[in-house]
């Protein structure tokens, strides 16, 4: 008997794979959100002839979504080439409907860092820099190892006397600390280990500048296989008129640390004030 997995034919260009699940998963549709310093989230709908896929088979399992371009038309056997592979962990599972032939499901794929939002803690960190605090949380509280994250920083960060985490989930806590000192993060895929990797940076060295995209509305036109803009919208909202900050430094008690600024420069469509006390900015 052959040990090779069975070959399954699928009309979908994309592939969904969940560790430990041998059922055929035929991708029906997907949508994703990505941004810097925010865990990505991909919701993927799929069908399967297996009517008994359970939440235990999906949740907390390593998974990947492989995006592939359509094959060129013509004679001969064509092999699809992966355009991108998104690695992560399944954090959501849905059973959407069923018929005699197949059942429709959906899963939510996120990086492992997103699981930190499920961990609320109260803790005190002393004599540690922000990168050291983040690494301590990743290693000791969430079991991550060196291959799971990467710090590529151009500056040295001072140790802080004391940092408190109070009734705050780990993801929000480290994102807040990193944002205070100008460190941002993104996610990549280690194709050798088949894992998602979070990378931390503090410079614009990796930014691509001067990029242009054609505007190609989808009304009877096509993008000819290149990235293009389909639509543009403009939204306006009322925002706060001014920002006020106050603080006190016992080492420099006579120092005036009260400030107020009109961030809108006189815009009459604004309202209200944002007041901040003791934001722990270094002075």
What are these regions (language model features)?
Residues 1-283:
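Amphipathic alpha-helical and helix-coil boundary elements used as assembly
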């Amino acid at each position: 008997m052959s040990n090779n997995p069975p070959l399954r034919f699928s009309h979908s260009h994309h592939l969904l794979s969940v560790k430990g699940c041998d059922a055929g998963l035929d991708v029906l549709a997907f949508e994703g959100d990505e941004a810097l310093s925010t865990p990505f989230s991909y919701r993927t709908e799929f069908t399967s002839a297996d009517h008994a896929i359970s939440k235990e088979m999906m949740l907390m399992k390593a998974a990947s979504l492989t995006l592939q371009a359509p094959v060129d038309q013509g004679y001969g056997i064509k092999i699809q080439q992966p355009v991108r592979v998104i690695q992560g962990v399944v954090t959501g599972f849905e059973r959407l409907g069923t018929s005699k032939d197949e059942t429709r499901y959906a899963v939510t794929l996120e990086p492992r860092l997103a699981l930190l939002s499920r961990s609320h803690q109260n803790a005190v960190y002393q004599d540690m820099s922000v990168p050291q605090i983040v690494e301590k949380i990743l290693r000791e509280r969430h079991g991550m190892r060196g291959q799971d994250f990467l710090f590529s920083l151009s500056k040295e960060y001072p140790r802080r006397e004391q940092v408190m985490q109070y009734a705050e989930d780990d993801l929000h806590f480290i994102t807040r600390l990193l944002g205070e000192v100008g460190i941002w993060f993104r996610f990549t895929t280690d194709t050798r280990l088949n894992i998602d990797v979070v990378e931390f940076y503090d410079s614009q060295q990796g930014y691509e500048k001067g990029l242009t995209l054609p505007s190609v509305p989808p009304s009877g036109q096509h993008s000819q296989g290149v990235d293009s803009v389909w639509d543009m919208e403009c939204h306006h909202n009322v925002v706060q008129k001014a920002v006020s900050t106050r603080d006190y430094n016992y080492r420099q008690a006579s120092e005036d640390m009260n400030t107020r600024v009109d961030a809108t420069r006189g815009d009459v469509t604004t309202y209200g004030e944002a007041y901040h006390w003791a934001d722990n900015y270094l002075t």
